[in-house]
Regions:
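Short active-site-adjacent helix-start/loop capping segments
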Residues: 23, 59-61, 67-71, 103-106
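Short, basic, glycine/proline-bearing loop/turn elements
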Residues: 30-33, 69, 280-281
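Short, well-structured secondary-structure segments
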Residues: 57-67, 93-97, 308
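N-terminal carbohydrate-binding accessory modules
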Residues: 1-55
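Active-site region of glycoside hydrolase catalytic domains
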Residues: 2-14, 84-320, 330-408
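Conserved strand-to-helix beginnings and helix N-cap segments that scaffold or border functional pockets
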Residues: 73, 77, 319-325
Length: 408
């Protein structure tokens, strides 16, 4: 069997384009489509070419499910056909984000719709079957725990559930969809590989909303569910059962366990770590490379699966981004030298994104631009968004040319 491209002992460099899609709208809630807001639909070819120019070997890039399947079972492949062909022609590998927060408009109640797991699996199967040999690397669903917090615990995104009960309902539905997605893709493309991506979570202080044990276990709940670990005696079994999840629903995961090929760790030094205030609000805590090391080691020790840094960057000045690029890569190389198989490094986002708070505001998108990328997006007098290479772009190119100095 041919060795997968990530397993050749090199450190592979990639970038990712922010691809949050929440198309539902309501009073005080605008739809958010990051591709539309960043004019990626118009500039996708330039954006992909820029990624290759930066030195990226792979890109984390998502599919807007709500546009590709505008009606149940009816697919519009025209744009994806063009994009996939261009990626192949320029030699840019894609780790396909099949789900990045939002569902199609026709799926009422979104993630808690009883048909969601099979709907998302059917969509994933159709994508995998059509693009087999071009796109063979998949993330079934990006950041499931964040997804469950926003959609099930905080009531921020549809279906707007709240509390532990809502979190439990959403995370179980998401995890079941992830299992069915991996099963369906594997059925039509045996060469497919899977990168499970979740947000890193770290906490400081004592004013926690749940016990520290529950919080620390809950950050792993999606991966523990899909790999069949949440059985009686597991801390999350009691948590989920206590919030209305039936025993037969939990047992389903043990009977249908899947294992991803890689674990993707998302880490941002400025806000992955938080401190809770007594009133329940949170403040971000700067954690630097110590936080990155901590999360990578936690996932490696728990699952024993190869690691990919699937998102990291720092907002603010170009100087701060330059510093983080160097610091984070040095930490990754130290971990590799110690025997931790960190196989990939992804600067995410590749270019400017629009803060999610845009969805709950009336101000123009430009007021919510967050510059964290190798490329800054700047609006011109003609309203077009220009892509402007920063010094971080050149520094990333240089690091790619140098390559990793240490092999895993």
């Amino acid at each position: 069997m041919t060795t997968h491209w990530l397993r050749d002992e090199r450190l592979h460099f990639g970038v990712g384009i922010e691809d949050t899609f929440v198309p539902q709208q309501g009073i005080g809630r605008r739809p958010i489509d990051e591709y539309e807001l960043m004019q990626h639909y118009e500039n996708w070819r330039e954006d992909l070419d820029l990624a290759v120019e930066a030195g990226a070997e792979f890109i984390r890039w998502g599919i807007p499910w709500y546009l590709v399947e505008p009606r149940p079972g009816e697919f519009d492949w025209r744009w994806l056909d063009e994009v996939s062909a261009h990626m192949q022609s320029i030699g840019l590998r894609c780790v396909v984000d099949l789900m990045h927060y939002g569902t199609p408009l026709w799926l009422d109640n979104q993630f808690v719709n009883a048909s969601y797991p099979e709907r998302v699996a059917s969509y994933a199967r159709a994508v995998a079957e059509r693009y087999a040999g071009v796109w063979d690397d998949f993330t079934p669903l990006n950041e499931p725990v964040i997804n469950a917090i926003y959609c099930g615990e905080d009531g921020t995104w549809p279906p707007y559930l709240t509390g532990d009960d809502g979190f439990s309902k959403v995370i179980v539905a998401l995890a079941k969809g992830m299992v069915r997605t991996q099963q369906e893709i594997a059925a039509v493309n045996p060469s497919a590989r899977f990168v499970h991506v979740d947000a890193g979570f770290r906490w400081e202080g004592d004013d926690l909303p749940l016990s520290r044990e529950v919080l620390e276990e809950r950050r792993f709940v999606s991966l523990d569910l899909i790999t069949g670990r949440v059985v009686p005696g597991h801390p999350m079994h009691a948590y989920l059962a206590g919030n209305g999840i039936r025993e037969d629903d939990l047992a389903w995961f043990a009977d249908n366990a899947v294992t991803p090929d890689y674990v993707g760790v998302n880490y941002y030094p400025g806000f992955t770590t938080v401190r809770y205030r007594p009133d329940g609000a949170t403040d971000p805590v700067e954690a630097g490379t110590a936080g990155l090391r901590d999360l990578i080691e936690l996932y490696w020790n728990r699952y024993g699966l190869p690691i990919v840094v699937t998102e990291t960057s720092r907002g603010g000045s170009v100087e701060s981004r330059l510093a983080w690029l160097g610091e984070s890569l040095e930490e990754v190389e130290r971990l590799r030298a110690e025997g931790v198989p960190v196989l990939g490094y992804t600067w995410f986002p590749f270019f400017t994104l629009v803060d999610w708070l845009y969805r709950h505001d009336a101000k123009p998108a430009d007021d919510w631009f967050v510059h964290m990328g190798l490329v800054d997006v700047v609006r011109g007098a003609d309203r077009r968004l220009a892509r402007v290479r920063t010094e971080v772009f050149a520094a990333f190119q240089e690091r790619v040319r140098e390559g990793a100095t240490v092999r895993a």
